[in-house]
Amino acid sequence: MSTAARIAPRATARLQLHAGFTLDDAALQVDYHARLGVSHLYLSPVGCAVPGSTHGYDNIDPTRVNPELGGETALRALSDAARAHGLGLLLDIVPNHMAAHPGNTWWMDLLRHGRDGRHGAWFDVDWDAPGAGGRLLLPVLDRPLEQAIADGLLRLEGDDAGGWVLRHHDQVFALAPGRAGAPRGAGARAWGAGGKAGTRRGEGALQALLERQHYRLIWWRAGNDRCNYRRFFDITSLVALRCERADVFRAVHALPLRLLAEGVIDGVRVDHVDGLTDPSGYVQRLRRALDAAGARRGLAAGEALLYVEKILAPDETLPARWPCHGTTGYDFMDQVGALLHDPAGEAPLASLWTRACGGAGAGR
């Protein structure tokens, strides 16, 4: 086992991975970072994300390394290169949310089968919210539903499995199976091709089809008032996961725990820990899981690195009951930023702001 696994972090170099800067590209820079003096490379999320993602936080499959980044083979090659230079690897993980995207099989299963499906309880949906009618409310339409139907913006399309999905611009929604789903045969093909588009009969049939689904499409302007699922802040396309459930936790963390046990990575950084239902319980559960995985490669309890993205208020400290190595350093960056700024510059900068804005924002 490499001694890099036991190096105490002194500085990390964060690498933002995407199709234009892959794991292979990162491997070419290992020598530079080693000479720079960092102890660990800190990687942005490597799970499968929305195609073309430039950041990786819109993941659609956390169980596989994104092929756009080079896949697991490239990740292992980067790890080997880092080890050869005495560096460790930290991996950013995203347990709070996933992207609502047709490539997300968990999400599409939820749309197709509703609360009683295999993944019906995996996402944080309040199925019994007042006015929801036991359905998931999706504030995704750019106009009211009736107008969207009349304008031909909701259409049936064939999918790769030989079935049907519903499309609204670049958004795709699974349909319930059986009689609740799309019509069959030549009638369905004609409808999907637009044979009934624009007719009252066709609009009524589409409305009836939508009423049989486990979700209801609503105008985005109603989102804040009617949305009945937890989001990443107010981003409708990022749907919160219920990592407090053991089955969800296992599925989301299977890849990083395996990579840790096999010596590919040395620890994790948890994105948006405060977004989770039970941050304290989550950190404690993750610590136990990391310890179990680390033991398989000879690490002592608490040795696998665990950092959390925790934005501390000026009078806030990291909870002592959280068994982690600390935050990702936003509080430290604030202190460094304050050190590098001359407090005497506040008055002239405020004056410049006032003149540039014509008095707007004065005193702020």
Language-model segments: residues:
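Acidic/aromatic-lined carbohydrate-recognition and catalytic surfaces
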Residues: 2-226, 230, 262, 272-357
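Short, surface-exposed alpha-helical recognition segments that flank or form part
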Residues: 17, 21, 240-247
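Short linear interaction motifs
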Residues: 145-147, 250, 362-363
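N- or domain-start disorder-to-order transition segments that initiate the globular core
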Residues: 229-231, 236, 241-245
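Structured alpha-helical segments in the cores of large, soluble enzyme domains
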Residues: 248-261
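A conserved hydrophobic secondary-structure block that centers on an alpha-helix together
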Residues: 268-270
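C-terminal or mid-to-C-terminal helical accessory/interaction module adjacent to the motor/catalytic core
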Residues: 356-364
